[in-house]
């Protein structure tokens, strides 16, 4: 049997699916389907920079994760979306970073919201600036 979340499906637009044929993890959803009239918001890769372009948390993965999530929330808001509208994250993390700190920052921001998004994560040798430790992009679906 497939576990389906109906929280947003009542509007007939977003359905979160965790089929029993795939590993279940409360940190992410395996499949998200979108139907109907919706607005899709694409947030390009965000790094740990503040509004002046200064890098926040040089050498501190947790501080950078917190800034990245703050930037994503600001980008989502600019696009008319909220964090709970995110259906997909892509995370790029420089090899050797303490993942637990990044996940703790994510959980602190995500809180008790239902339906965590589908997630892809890749370890990389480096990013656009040598002080960047992570980058995250997101896709959000806003019911109309």
Identify the residue ranges that each predicted region occupies.
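N-terminal presequence-like segments and the immediate start of the first folded domain
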Residues: 1-70, 74-87, 93-144
